[in-house]
Swiss-Prot record:
One of its GO terms (biological process) is L-leucine biosynthetic process. Its EC number is 4.2.1.33. HAMAP family: LeuC_type1. It is an enzyme of class 4 (lyase). Heterodimer of LeuC and LeuD. SUPFAM superfamilies: Aconitase iron-sulfur domain. The lineage of its organism: Bacteria, Pseudomonadati, Pseudomonadota, Alphaproteobacteria, Hyphomicrobiales. It comes from Allorhizobium ampelinum (strain ATCC BAA-846 / DSM 112012 / S4) (Agrobacterium vitis (strain S4)). It catalyses: (2R,3S)-3-isopropylmalate = (2S)-2-isopropylmalate. The keyword Acetylation does not apply. GO terms for molecular function: 3-isopropylmalate dehydratase activity; 4 iron, 4 sulfur cluster binding; metal ion binding. This is 3-isopropylmalate dehydratase large subunit. Catalyzes the isomerization between 2-isopropylmalate and 3-isopropylmalate, via the formation of 2-isopropylmaleate. Keywords: 4Fe-4S, Amino-acid biosynthesis, Branched-chain amino acid biosynthesis, Iron, Iron-sulfur, Leucine biosynthesis, Lyase, Metal-binding.
Length: 469
């Protein structure tokens, strides 16, 4: 009888092509997602070597990082570098026979939102993309992680990847979430607990009652930010919610193929007694709505808290780092989080750009107005999310409140397109990173949930969504 295995062990073993004596492994890759920023050199490498894409039907190309989100984007991309990258992806996809969703295709959107909604992402698969937030797809019980540009070329050419097996880490969130606390708060709390290096060298499996209670959208939010916790990939075991989400998706198996797939998918869970190298347990009942205060995703605190004093930190290097973060953010120790005023609000990204996220923001904004001192932008994560939101009338709620309603794309999550902060502008953002300059030169980012961002847009400062009337 074989030893009990974790979910990660099972998927890894099922895709193992070869293992060397030093632990170096060759894994088969089921799905490869491609976007315009990390793929040009990879395709050029294939072209120069006279190689083909090994499995074009297992590859999907989507433009997302550089595309404008303004209504006039059909007129073209003004920034030359961005335009060249987008044009290169279109040409490369055509030359190598890879399916491509351009900015004119309603299926276009952020690659990590497009994959699941197309049924391209399925349980038990290995999935890679030249993007660190590929961990999002782990919400389906898939082993998914980002890869570098040279690895993109390797996967295109061979449909395999060289890597060493990671350690197993379990993060269990027990109990029920209080009202007003969301998947975004769960993952921010986890990162606050373990730090941005806490998962280094591990694949994290998220489990527990609070995780199981999340919708698929919520699970994607949690897995999306696994990389901010230091782990390359995050996993959640698939269940009936997963299967129902997948059924009927364009690329999902159907009929007898679906029945066969379900038999396999139902084996994708950690065996009782399987070994984890590290376990972290959180109590969902104690989790508050969370706001980041510094320039790292681990710099988080309850909305009812105050900006911490770095002098309370014993480690000199960490203390210096946190003082630098406060200086960059223009904040002082002891400041109440609810006293921090904001200039901008960004609702979107591969973390929180799905229909559930937009519904949560719209529920707060309905029949209210964005503060006169705040500029708010809502960017759906895909053309299909946009279509669904408009069918539900969410766009009208956003526009009536004074928000901008945009076209799909990565937008203000990162300063690679026209959506960016000006120096020292402060933004309540539903994205995943608050690094220096992430949303624009000297821009100040606070990471929050969609409902918290919407409430801040109305109040002009952070508020506790649990007390929102």
């Amino acid at each position: 009888m074989s030893a009990p295995r974790t979910l990660y062990d099972k998927i890894f073993d099922d895709h193992l092509v070869d293992r060397q004596d030093d632990g170096t492994c060759l894994l088969y890759i089921d799905r490869h997602l491609v976007h315009e920023v990390t793929s040009p050199q990879a395709f050029e490498g294939l072209r120069m070597a006279g190689r083909k894409v090994h499995a074009p039907t297992r590859t999907l190309a989507v433009v997302d990082h550089n595309v404008p989100t303004t209504p006039d984007r059909a007129e073209g991309i003004k920034n030359e570098e961005s335009r060249i990258q987008v044009e290169a992806l279109a040409k490369n996809a055509a030359d190598f026979g890879v399916e491509y969703y351009s900015e004119k295709d309603k299926r276009q959107g952020i690659v990590h939102i497009v994959g699941p909604e197309q049924g391209f992402t399925l349980p038990g698969m290995t999935i890679v993309c030249g993007d660190s937030h590929t961990s999002t797809h782990g919400a389906f019980g898939a082993l998914a992680h980002g890869i570098g540009t040279s690895e993109v070329e390797h996967v295109l050419a061979t449909q395999t990847l060289i890597q060493k097996k990671a350690k197993n880490m379990l993060v269990r969130v027990d109990g029920k979430l209080p009202a007003g606390v969301t998947a975004k708060d769960i993952i921010l709390a986890i990162i606050g607990e373990i730090g941005t290096a806490g998962g280094t060298g591990h694949v994290i499996e998220f489990a527990g009652e609070a995780i199981e209670a999340l919708s698929m959208e919520g699970r994607m939010t949690v897995c999306n930010m696994t990389i901010e916790g230091g782990a390359r990939a995050g996993l959640i075991a698939p269940d009936e919610k997963t299967f129902e989400y997948i059924k009927g998706k364009p690329r999902a198996p159907k009929g007898e193929e679906l029945e066969m797939a379900l038999q396999y998918w139902k084996t994708l869970h950690t065996d009782e007694g399987a070994h984890f190298d590290r376990t972290v347990v959180l109590d969902a009942a104690n989790l508050p709505p969370i706001v980041s205060w510094g320039s790292s995703p681990e710099d988080v605190i309850s909305v009812q808290g105050v900006v911490p004093n770095p002098d309370d930190i014993a480690d000199e290097n960490k203390r210096t780092s946190k003082w630098r973060a406060l200086d960059y953010m223009g904040l002082k120790p002891g400041t109440k989080i609810t006293d921090i005023t904001i200039d901008r609000v960004f609702i979107g990204s591969c973390t929180n750009g799905r229909i559930e996220d937009l519904r949560a923001a719209a529920a707060v904004l309905k029949d209210r107005k964005v503060a006169s001192t705040v500029s708010a932008m809502v960017v759906p994560g895909s053309g299909l999310v946009k279509e669904q939101a408009e069918a539900e009338g969410l766009d009208k709620i956003f526009l009536d409140a004074g928000c901008e309603w945009r076209e799909p794309g990565c937008s203000m999550c990162l300063a690679m397109n026209d959506d960016r902060l000006k120096p020292e502008e402060r933004c309540a953002s539903t994205s995943n990173r608050n690094f220096e300059g992430r949303q624009g030169y000297k821009g100040r980012t606070h990471l929050v949930s969609p409902a918290m961002a919407a409430a801040a847009a109305i109040a002009g400062h952070f508020v506790d969504i649990r007390e929102w009337k």
